[in-house]
Amino acid sequence: RQNWSYALIDRDIYDINSYASRFIQEQAGRTLLSQVSTTVTYDMRDSRIEPRSGYVVRVGGDYAGIGGGVNYFRSRADAQYYIPFERWLNDPDFVLVLAAGGGILTPLGDKDDRIVDRFFLGGENLRGFYLGGAGPRDLATGDSLGGQILWTSSAEMRFPLPLPNEIGLLGRAFVDVGSLHGIPSSYYNQSLYPGARPVDDADPRVSVGVGFSWRSPIGLINIDFGKPVIKQDYDKDQLFRLGFGTRF
């Protein structure tokens, strides 16, 4: 199926901390975002709520610039493949999930892209790191800058816990891999940004961890414990993460 949407947003960035990165401070002010988006989804999973077999692929794009003050094209794609282990382990809750995703932000026109429109790495798409905890950063302040090119992949083994089924708990062990890079070349111009220390590399980050999902009365609750095993010194770790919504 294919979905289309249009967004017209008047964005105002203000009250920025005086200690924030120069790259963030220059973003202060109002911009008008006029964006057309589309997503094509091919879903062959056995269930959208709690899949145990099949796969889903999503491909989409966002075009901003129709009458607004922001101009870019952002492409994105992701896929998940579910491999049931019931045949070998005699339990439908043993499922291997392989996932991958990515995106590219291409600025259009003669202006640099804005931080808020870039991709960020960490949190949901790279457990063991804070949202924005990996990827381009201003070392002078420690602020994340986002990036134009993102890719992620993960392998996750889901398994039942030795508890009554009515409790609704499922465990998992995972390996996450991801990379984010790409910032404007103007960021390295010290005459424009004196004192700034931008760093940008495409080296992959890797984390491992365990977690569980609880089908609570108010919805799905996810708890993950992640540990980076390949990272940069300036990355920001997140050992514990609590999330709400559908991880399946």
Question: What are these regions, as identified by a protein language model?
Answer:
Residues 175, 214-218, 248:
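A generic beta-sheet turn/junction motif
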Residues 187-233, 240:
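C-terminal structured "cap/appendage" subdomains that terminate the fold
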Residues 3-197, 234, 242-247:
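C-terminal outer-membrane beta-barrel translocator/porin domains of Gram-negative envelope proteins
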